[in-house]
């Protein structure tokens, strides 16, 4: 007994131990799960925080525009994203967004503003434009206080230029947007066009089913148990309403079938009244027995006087015309080839019907009765298989009822076919134009640059490149007239390349101002223009300087010298390596300042500074260039003016080795130690003295002759 009790106690203890172990395991599992949750939650919090940070970053990364900063050679140096509504440009490091450290640039020079309400970009100068004219939009000086910017406009401040590219939605007038950025309106139109293309075939199928249903109702007549062919010959003219005159021996089910057919025909008559009036040339005969005294329009009466076959044909024509109108609109948007095949099938059905009608007309002329089976088979062809083949009444073929005259459809079908072929050809052309090879993004950017350059340079030409007349400077002050004379003096000096000609007298020389007279535009290729005007942000020419001098009251000698210097700088900017154009530009500088010194507009010190700098460069170029140009000074020959025509000129070659020879040969021109053009005072004085002596001798001879004549008169 004791053994049994001890065994039971041991079993109870084992059970309790197992329960405790299970409880401990469960608790441990829960703790592990909690620990796992605690380990997972920080990661989740971290990811959620990262997501929030990303969202904030995305909000901060909203870009309104991009500014492409250019180097002097036209390449892109840096791209700056405009993430604010205002972008300040100047020389202050703290307050400006684009830093420009150039002379003439103020701390806050200008700002670019994006107006959110109007959705436009503006350039607002923070300095009065009359004080500082260094701001230029597409090479044109900035005049207004605030001006609207266009996409891909080039803004230059001092010698720094950059191009603005829009990213925010902008309302721009008469400007071309890039093809990869399409407005929302164009996207909506494309979606609507796609929906219409999808809905068009389904709508046409529904129309076709409705018309076929109407045709089946029109051709099926109520079957009678007692019908005699003799009565059919003397029956009144067949109309849609004449079915009421036929004796009714059918059941009520057939009467129910007649009513929807009449309603359907009435609706079809109302729909097709416009088409029947165009095809019918003479009115059909009216029925004597009117139904319930209703007064109907002429178009509905014409439909009643026609055969069921003719009604069917008119309905088919209207269907084809409506389909052609729809397909013409869809072809412009790119119609499918399946619809064109359906139209061809319908046209073939029309031709078959016309052939059957021609056979019937021939049989009528020969007075041969038409069999009912043929008429039934002719009616069954265009209809569905479920329709009943019942012969129509033959009263329309009698002599008493005149046949309705109508325009033959052969001409109509030919014209429609021609129209279809024309439209198909047009569509093929448009498809071929759309399926041309796609332009790369670089070509698109080049086209946009060319268009902006053309537009802006044409404005510059229309404003500053007008023809100059001497009469325009008569009313101006003496200082401006002297400046014009100095600019004209450059053309009197010409150049040629050494070794090109053997005889100096037969030299075909080129004026120094040939390449500076106008800015390059008309006689140059687009690739050259794109390269030139992407490097040269401030184009200047002698003609533009003269136009500004003529029209601008504040445009004086200081502004002329500044633009003239910029014109010569443009040569070195475009031609990076030394060449003959550098040589020509330095010679122009010497000749221009020489003429200004002679007119008294500048001092000797100013001239010497310019001469020394240009002459040093010319000496270097003479050593490095393969073909060294040679100056040719052109002067008016005063001694030969009486014998030769006006404007006769003499060409004199200038060279450092020939100075002594020219002096010994009594040449009217000599050159000092600096190589400048100087006239001989001794020769001029000797000429003047000889002229005075000859005048005095002639006066004495005249006095002697007059005294002798007086003495003879007194004697």
UniProtKB/Swiss-Prot annotation:
Bias type Polar residues, positions: 366-389, 662-672
Bias-annotated ranges (Basic and acidic residues): 307-316
Keywords attached to this entry: Bromodomain, Coiled coil
Annotated organism of origin: Dictyostelium discoideum
Secreted found in the keyword field: no
Biased composition (Low complexity): 20-45, 186-204, 215-227, 234-254, 261-281, 405-414
Coiled-coil ranges (or none): 322-368, 437-470
CDD domains (alphabetical): Bromodomain (cd04369)
Domain of life (superkingdom): Eukaryota
Span list, region Disordered: 18-46, 186-425, 653-715
Key word Ribosomal protein present: no
Protein name as it appears in the record: Bromodomain-containing protein DDB_G0278469
Segments of skewed composition (Acidic residues): 332-359, 684-715
A UniProt-annotated Pfam family: Bromodomain
Positions of the Bromo domain: 474-599
